[in-house]
């Protein structure tokens, strides 16, 4: 605590402890507030050692001020404490935090007005970083590209080869350069000569197209007038530095040869990026255990190398990013809907594929399995085990609905028999629609007979008993008729022997 509290000593510490936290409040600043401010600065990745000087506190105030509108109350309290400390370092006589903030605003406003007045009175000067600068005589001269820029470019090519990020790197390092500077950058590359040959072919094609669309003027040029640049002039092979400067800086009909040449280089770099990145965006798929964040990084890196318009790239992002994700992430992304932002997708899929997500899926699977064991599947096995010949879905005897048995039914319990509805017996003892055997007992409720009984009803081969009795009665009636009329036929001559 001693090191943190040593920001103020002596008279400054006395002045710090006399300042009130709020107007009219009895509470004043103490050493603990300095300790707290130091810890908060470390939490915000700022250097607490800057609190020891007025310049350091001013830097901290400028750094924290943009975040005040959306910051928390702790951040606002930290900014107020630093403002009070800034006033103490500058020996301003203040009584509370509100006066310190007002004093800070007054000083900053007066400083800005003084700087604005100074800019109006001082002549404007051309930046010395620009390759074409104005010398003391007011002439436009060329400033050679610095060795540091060349070194940064060569290192980028050696480390990144021709990945998609090499294009914005080239655009940043060649800002405002003339063709002479750009050729210097290209000649500094030692390797990748095959790729550079492809780049030269693209430059030659663009130069030929420029000559076709911008034919040179016929006849001699007027005295003092410079010729118009050709394709080879823009490429820097047939033009001098002075001509390139004049074409770029002349007032009327200026031609920015450097910018035109940079566009040609970018076209060639796009082909080289495609050549060094043969993977198509259609082949980028998320692995089963790959984090969604890594998959998004690979997706956008490959998308950056695609030779397509921005509309096509937007369509690829909206369609393929979700389509090529793994099943776990795809299920989450489809639930978010098509209007979800990339931030929402990454937050929703955070942790998918990791041990926590796997444990969660396993717990859900075990919970559903236990639920099934308590209800549906066990009920199916139990009910079908009683009658293996039954076909179709299971049906509840209590409510009459399919899909569960009466044991798991949530409807109110029926009273009496589940089959006929009468009270006094159970369904297993119900005699409604059932047949008794020779012992006077009824068959099982399933409708099947015991195993030692014939399962199908055997149809008898003999005629029914009623037909046999009728036939005997008919024969007896015929015998009576024969005895009543013995002489009605020749049969009576021989008696009953015939």
From Swiss-Prot:
Span list, region Disordered: 447-483
Zinc fingers typed CCHC-type, residue spans: 394-411, 415-432
Region annotation PPIA/CYPA-binding loop: where it falls in the sequence: 215-223
Gene Ontology terms for molecular function: RNA binding; structural molecule activity; zinc ion binding
Residue positions of motif LYPX(n)L motif: 484-493
Positions of the UniProt region annotated as Interaction with membrane phosphatidylinositol 4,5-bisphosphate: 73-77
Claim: RNA-binding is one of the keywords in the record: yes
Coiled-coil stretches noted in the UniProt entry, renumbered to this chain: none
Interaction with Gp41: annotated span: 7-31
Gene Ontology biological-process entries: viral budding via host ESCRT complex; viral translational frameshifting
Location of the motif PTAP/PSAP motif: 460-463
Residue(s) at site: Cleavage: 130-131, 362-363, 381-382, 437-438, 453-454
Region (Interaction with host AP3D1): 12-19
Protein's UniProt keywords contain Signal: no
Keyword terms: AIDS, Capsid protein, Host cell membrane, Host cytoplasm, Host endosome, Host membrane, Host nucleus, Host-virus interaction, Lipoprotein, Membrane, Metal-binding, Methylation, Myristate, Phosphoprotein, Repeat, RNA-binding, Viral budding, Viral budding via the host ESCRT complexes, Viral nucleoprotein, Viral release from host cell, Virion, Zinc, Zinc-finger
Motif annotated as Nuclear export signal, chain positions: 16-22
Chain segments carrying region Interaction with membrane phosphatidylinositol 4,5-bisphosphate and RNA: 14-33
PTM comment, free text: Gag-Pol polyprotein: Specific enzymatic cleavages by the viral protease yield mature proteins.
Region (Dimerization/Multimerization of capsid protein p24): 276-362
Lipidation (N-myristoyl glycine): 2
Further remark: HIV-1 lineages are divided in three main groups, M (for Major), O (for Outlier), and N (for New, or Non-M, Non-O). The vast majority of strains found worldwide belong to the group M. Group O seems to be endemic to and largely confined to Cameroon and neighboring countries in West Central Africa, where these viruses represent a small minority of HIV-1 strains. The group N is represented by a limited number of isolates from Cameroonian persons. The group M is further subdivided in 9 clades or subtypes (A to D, F to H, J and K).
UniProt protein name: Gag polyprotein
Species assigned in the record: Human immunodeficiency virus type 1 group O (isolate MVP5180) (HIV-1)
Gene: gag
């Amino acid at each position: 605590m001693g090191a943190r509290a040593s920001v103020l000593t002596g008279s400054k510490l006395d002045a710090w402890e006399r300042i009130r936290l709020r107007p009219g409040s009895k509470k004043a600043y103490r050493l603990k507030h300095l300790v707290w401010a130091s810890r908060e600065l470390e939490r915000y990745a700022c250097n607490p050692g800057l609190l020891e000087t007025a310049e350091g506190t001013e830097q901290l105030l400028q750094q924290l001020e943009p975040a005040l509108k959306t910051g928390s109350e702790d951040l606002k309290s930290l900014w107020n404490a630093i403002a009070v400390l800034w006033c103490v370092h500058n020996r301003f006589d203040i009584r509370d935090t509100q006066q310190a903030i007002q004093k800070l605003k007054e000083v900053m406003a007066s400083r800005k007005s003084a700087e604005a007045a100074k800019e109006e009175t001082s002549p404007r000067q051309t930046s010395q970083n620009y390759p074409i600068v104005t010398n003391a005589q007011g002439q436009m001269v060329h400033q050679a590209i610095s060795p540091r820029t060349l070194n940064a470019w060569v290192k980028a090519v050696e480390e990144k080869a021709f990945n998609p990020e090499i294009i914005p790197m080239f655009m940043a390092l060649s800002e405002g350069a003339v063709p002479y500077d750009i050729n210097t950058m290209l000649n500094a590359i030692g390797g990748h000569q095959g790729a550079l040959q492809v780049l030269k072919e693209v430059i030659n094609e663009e130069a030929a197209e420029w000559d076709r669309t911008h034919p040179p003027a016929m006849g001699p040029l007027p005295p003092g007038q410079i010729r118009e640049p050709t394709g080879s002039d823009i490429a820097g092979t047939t033009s001098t530095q002075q001509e390139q400067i004049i074409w770029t800086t002349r007032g009327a009909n200026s031609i920015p040869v450097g910018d035109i040449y940079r566009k040609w280089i970018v076209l060639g770099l796009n082909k080289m990026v495609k050549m060094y990145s043969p993977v198509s965006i259609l082949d980028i798929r998320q692995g089963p255990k790959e984090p969604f964040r890594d998959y998004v990084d690979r997706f956008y890196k490959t998308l950056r190398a695609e030779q397509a318009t921005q509309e096509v790239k937007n369509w690829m992002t909206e369609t393929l990013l979700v389509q090529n994700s793994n099943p776990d992430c795809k299920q989450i992304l489809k639930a978010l809907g098509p209007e979800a932002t990339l931030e929402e997708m990454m937050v929703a899929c955070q942790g998918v594929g990791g041990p926590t997500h796997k444990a969660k899926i396993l717990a859900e699977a075990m919970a559903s399995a236990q639920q099934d064991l308590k209800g549906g599947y066990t009920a199916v096995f139990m009910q079908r085990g009683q009658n293996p010949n039954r076909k179709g879905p299971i049906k509840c005897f209590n409510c009459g609905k399919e899909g569960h048995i009466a044991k798991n039914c949530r409807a109110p319990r029926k009273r009496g028999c589940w089959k006929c509805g009468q009270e006094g017996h159970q369904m297993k003892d119900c005699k409604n629609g059932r047949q008794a055997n020779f012992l006077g007992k009824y068959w099982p409720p399933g409708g099947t007979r015991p195993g030692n009984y014939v399962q199908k009803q055997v149809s008898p081969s003999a005629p029914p008993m009623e037909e046999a009795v009728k036939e005997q009665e008919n024969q007896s009636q015929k015998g009576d008729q024969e005895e009543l009329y013995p002489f009605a036929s020749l049969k009576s001559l021989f008696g009953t022997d015939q």
